[in-house]
């Protein structure tokens, strides 16, 4: 099986960049890994894009927006969970923009997806 650019950069992002260059905590690394596991499952099950054939060019703004909507509609995720998944995707595309400048426009489009306002819990005063 031929390695795709998405597989190569996602592997580097999760196993080298986050723990080494960024120094992220193990829980952050696991949360990011889980976010991309969900994205890959979404691509396979909803978009008919097999993970082993997924390329960076296919993971565009429209796909990410559909993924986020799927999280809310089908998995009943709250805005805060959706925003956590989006933060992982944003972080990856920020990394990718520097590693592969030819994707800068696509990266900027994905990075333009805003966080959704999440309900804040009421303040409890004594």
Q: Model segments located where?
A:
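Blade/loop signatures of beta-propeller domains
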Residues: 2-4
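Gly/serine-rich nucleotide phosphate-binding loop at the start of the catalytic core
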Residues: 6, 31
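N-terminal core-binding DNA-recognition domain of tyrosine recombinases/integrases
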Residues: 11-27, 33, 37-121
């Amino acid at each position: 099986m031929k390695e795709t650019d998405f597989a190569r950069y996602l592997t580097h992002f999760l196993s080298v960049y986050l723990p080494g260059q960024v120094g992220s905590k193990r829980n952050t690394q696991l949360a990011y890994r889980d976010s991309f596991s969900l994205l890959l499952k979404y691509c396979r099950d909803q978009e008919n894009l097999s993970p082993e054939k997924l390329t960076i060019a296919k993971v565009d703004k429209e796909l990410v927006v559909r993924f986020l909507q799927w999280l809310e509609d089908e998995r009943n995720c709250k805005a805060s969970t959706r925003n956590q998944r989006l933060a992982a995707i944003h972080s990856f595309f920020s990394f990718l923009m520097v590693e592969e400048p030819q994707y800068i426009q696509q990266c900027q489009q994905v990075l333009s997806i805003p966080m959704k306002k999440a309900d804040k819990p009421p303040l409890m005063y004594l």
